[in-house]
Amino acid sequence: MNFFDIHKIPNKGIPLSVQRKLWLRNFMQAFFVVFFVYMAMYLIRNNFKAAQPFLKEEIGLSTLELGYIGLAFSITYGLGKTLLGYFVDGRNTKRIISFLLILSAITVLIMGFVLSYFGSVMGLLIVLWGLNGVFQSVGGPASYSTISRWAPRTKRGRYLGFWNTSHNIGGAIAGGVALWGANVFFHGNVIGMFIFPSVIALLIGIATLFIGKDDPEELGWNRTEEIWEEPVDKENIDSQGMTKWEIFKKYILGNPVIWILCVSNVFVYIVRIGIDNWAPLYVSEHLHFSKGDAVNTIFYFEIGALVASLLWGYVSDLLKGRRAIVAIGCMFMITFVVLFYTNATSVMMVNISLFALGALIFGPQLLIGVSLTGFVPKNAISVANGMTGSFAYLFGDSMAKVGLAAIADPTRNGLNIFGYTLSGWTDVFIVFYVALFLGMILLGIVAFYEEKKIRSLKI
């Protein structure tokens, strides 16, 4: 049998009451595999953001060149989310992402050696960071698939929210871990910010490869809905016996909710990545903060995001799955926090702003993914989540990295959009406001579809 297949075995006839007692222990094995793997992926993703000021100073890269390297990741990551998501649906997604983490770690390790021996070889740096994007692309969709196979619908928001803290934790400590490793083992050289975290990720990938099951039916149990006596979604019933391509055409390509969520995610990511990616550079160039304070901006943003992951999924569960309404509330509050951020001048004000922004923007970032699990069958969750991610990274993330870089870069003349030239950090924040407004409108449509779905299932 294929190493990456789900190996379901005949039902053992274990009473449902016994399965429920054993469920948490077995679920936690699978859960913590995807949790730690995804956390490790952020150690070898956010290290690049933390290294940006050092890459400019030590290697001589420009702001725009850093943007192009980031764009390579965005494009491959975005395309890979859908293409690899289609491939992994119906397979052992838990095992697949452990294997992909190993490949990702090896790639970043090579990137560190390239920086050490060759310096700023732009072509090679773009290829390697783009390859890292391919290997990491399906981490989120695969994790959603594994957790959705185990978690009951009425508790899915909180478990996916708790899982979402994995990249908040990984993202929060990535800069500190990378900088500590560089200072301790590489005499402060920026190459250590790539080599050290990649070794940690490699060890985690190897350690998690054989732990846990991807589906209760691999244990000879009933499906999750039967274990918890929940109604089975119409999509999961109707999709039985359909080919993967038929499922993709009907429940992904032909599903208007998925398309609306895809476009909504673009606007969410313009704000999320725009703040997250450029905060260190913004405070160092515009507010003249020290390098240490610049790196710490990532920490405060990610700690705020940690709060969001724990809070908003649980709140949406309490509202019986009304994910879009909660997401709209978060985006509305962000408009006020962005205003505070633009007027912040001290380290404390900036860090408070970033904490609040993280606590709010990761609400819709999480809930868009949770929302789509209610509109597609389980064996299409990876590709559905991947497709929203593809839109987010190909359009939202790339705009945030290259578009906003062109607007903010003081050595350039700004970016011309519809005859209007956007230039400077003030115009960057105007882009955020437009994205928030459009995102709220689209999520309002999704909220309508969610309400119909909830009432049809009589939750």
For the regions a protein language model found, what residue spans apply to each?
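Cytoplasmic helix-loop-helix junction between adjacent transmembrane helices
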Residues: 128-166
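C-terminal transmembrane helical hairpin of 12-TM major facilitator-type secondary transporters
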Residues: 322-371
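Hydrophobic core of transmembrane alpha-helices in multi-pass small-molecule transporters
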Residues: 107, 121-138, 349-363, 367
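C-terminal ends and interior cores of transmembrane alpha-helices
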Residues: 102-119, 332-345
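Cytoplasmic membrane-interface "Motif A"-like loop-to-helix N-cap segments
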Residues: 90-101, 317-331
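Extracytoplasmic gate region of multi-pass secondary transporters
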Residues: 48-52, 254-309, 396-404
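Helix-loop-helix hairpin linking two adjacent transmembrane segments in secondary transporters
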Residues: 163, 167-216
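Residue-level signature of mid-helix packing/kink "hotspots" within the transmembrane helices
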Residues: 46, 74-82, 172, 302-306, ...
